[in-house]
Protein backbone atom coordinates (compact mmCIF):
# COMPACT_ATOMS: atom_id res chain seq x y z
CA UNK A 1 0.00 0.00 0.00
CA UNK A 2 1.32 3.45 -0.88
CA UNK A 3 1.40 6.43 1.49
CA UNK A 4 -1.46 8.22 -0.32
CA UNK A 5 -3.66 5.12 -0.13
CA UNK A 6 -2.86 4.65 3.55
CA UNK A 7 -3.81 8.27 4.32
CA UNK A 8 -7.01 7.99 2.27
CA UNK A 9 -8.10 5.00 4.38
CA UNK A 10 -7.25 6.50 7.80
CA UNK A 11 -9.97 7.37 10.28
CA UNK A 12 -10.24 10.92 11.63
CA UNK A 13 -8.59 9.73 14.83
CA UNK A 14 -5.68 8.15 12.96
CA UNK A 15 -5.22 11.32 10.90
CA UNK A 16 -5.13 13.28 14.15
CA UNK A 17 -2.42 10.97 15.51
CA UNK A 18 -0.43 11.29 12.28
CA UNK A 19 -0.77 15.10 12.31
CA UNK A 20 0.51 15.36 15.89
CA UNK A 21 3.39 12.98 15.11
CA UNK A 22 4.48 15.20 12.19
CA UNK A 23 5.01 18.06 14.64
CA UNK A 24 6.69 15.95 17.33
CA UNK A 25 9.42 13.68 15.94
CA UNK A 26 9.64 11.56 19.12
CA UNK A 27 6.52 11.45 21.26
CA UNK A 28 5.39 9.15 24.05
CA UNK A 29 2.09 7.32 24.01
CA UNK A 30 0.78 9.40 26.93
CA UNK A 31 1.75 12.69 25.24
CA UNK A 32 0.22 11.56 21.95
CA UNK A 33 -2.98 10.46 23.66
CA UNK A 34 -3.29 13.78 25.47
CA UNK A 35 -2.53 15.86 22.37
CA UNK A 36 -5.15 13.99 20.31
CA UNK A 37 -7.69 13.91 23.16
CA UNK A 38 -8.08 10.15 22.75
CA UNK A 39 -7.93 7.40 25.34
CA UNK A 40 -4.55 5.76 25.75
CA UNK A 41 -6.06 2.42 24.64
CA UNK A 42 -7.42 3.94 21.40
CA UNK A 43 -4.16 5.75 20.73
CA UNK A 44 -2.14 2.58 21.33
CA UNK A 45 -4.41 0.61 18.97
CA UNK A 46 -3.99 3.23 16.24
CA UNK A 47 -0.22 3.50 16.70
CA UNK A 48 0.25 -0.29 16.63
CA UNK A 49 -1.64 -0.42 13.32
CA UNK A 50 0.61 2.36 12.03
CA UNK A 51 3.67 0.33 13.09
CA UNK A 52 2.33 -2.74 11.25
CA UNK A 53 1.81 -0.71 8.06
CA UNK A 54 5.27 0.85 8.25
CA UNK A 55 3.91 4.32 8.93
CA UNK A 56 5.36 4.67 12.44
CA UNK A 57 8.12 3.12 14.49
CA UNK A 58 8.76 2.67 18.18
CA UNK A 59 12.08 3.94 19.48
CA UNK A 60 14.27 2.44 22.17
CA UNK A 61 12.71 4.56 24.92
CA UNK A 62 9.07 3.85 24.00
CA UNK A 63 8.67 6.98 21.95
CA UNK A 64 7.02 6.94 18.55
CA UNK A 65 7.85 8.66 15.29
CA UNK A 66 6.81 8.48 11.65
CA UNK A 67 9.11 6.43 9.44
CA UNK A 68 11.26 8.29 6.93
CA UNK A 69 9.78 6.12 4.16
CA UNK A 70 6.26 7.25 5.04
CA UNK A 71 7.27 10.89 5.36
CA UNK A 72 8.89 10.72 1.92
CA UNK A 73 5.95 8.81 0.37
CA UNK A 74 8.10 5.77 -0.47
CA UNK A 75 5.91 3.12 1.17
Q: What residues fall within each predicted segment?
A:
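Short, cationic-aromatic polyanion-contact patches
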Residues: 3-14, 28, 58-75
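Short amphipathic alpha-helical interface segments
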Residues: 10-38, 45
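Intrinsic disorder/low-complexity segments enriched in polar/small residues
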Residues: 41, 45, 70-72
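Residue-level "edge-of-site" marker
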Residues: 45-46, 63
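Basic amphipathic alpha-helical segments that dock to polyanions
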Residues: 49-50
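Glycine-centered, phosphate/nucleic-acid-interacting loop/turn motifs that mediate DNA/RNA or nucleotide
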Residues: 54
